[in-house]
Amino acid sequence: MIEAELKARVRDVESVKAALAARSAGQRSKYQDTYYDLADDRLSSEGRELRLRTITTDNGRRSLLTYKEPTIDTASGSKPEYETEVGDPSVIDSLLRGLDLKVLVGFEKHCINYRFVSEGRELLATLVTVPELDGTFIELETIVPESELAEAMEVVRTTLRQLGIADGDLTTEQYTDAVLATRKASGLP
């Protein structure tokens, strides 16, 4: 399955929140993301991602292990994705480190998730702030077979426009790259 997704900077956060709230109740959550790579950085250099994410909400906590293959749609950055829930993230962290993977970067995301249907597709819209980065972002995604990617991307684009997001606000920059660049510019590891 492919995560058909677009990400954009949000210029008018309150208007976008209101437009999303008209479609669905939002759920606040905190993501703690840790990305891993091989010693030679082969995963990231090939556009692959291996992430351990712990999501904390008012309803509890859960952790997911996600592997993403290289981008198949360069305009959006959409990638094939494989994800599973894990019971104990510390065990997975130990397992990955034991297999000689290293932590590439870890960071926190503060999110509000909205689930709704648009043009017959189940969508997840996430308003995101990363404490280390300036601004607010929106991610809008749906999971589809590769054969439906083009149609799904059009629904995602149209829905973003309906939410007040202009095409010029779209970005393919990854949070991992932005956080690493911010830390480097600040002299942090």
Placement of each model-derived feature along the sequence:
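Short, glycine- and charge-enriched coil/turn segments that flank and shape catalytic ligand pockets
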Residues: 59, 146-150
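N-terminal strand-loop-strand beta-hairpin
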Residues: 1-120, 157, 165-189
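Conserved, surface-exposed functional patches that form binding/active-site neighborhoods
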Residues: 99, 105-146
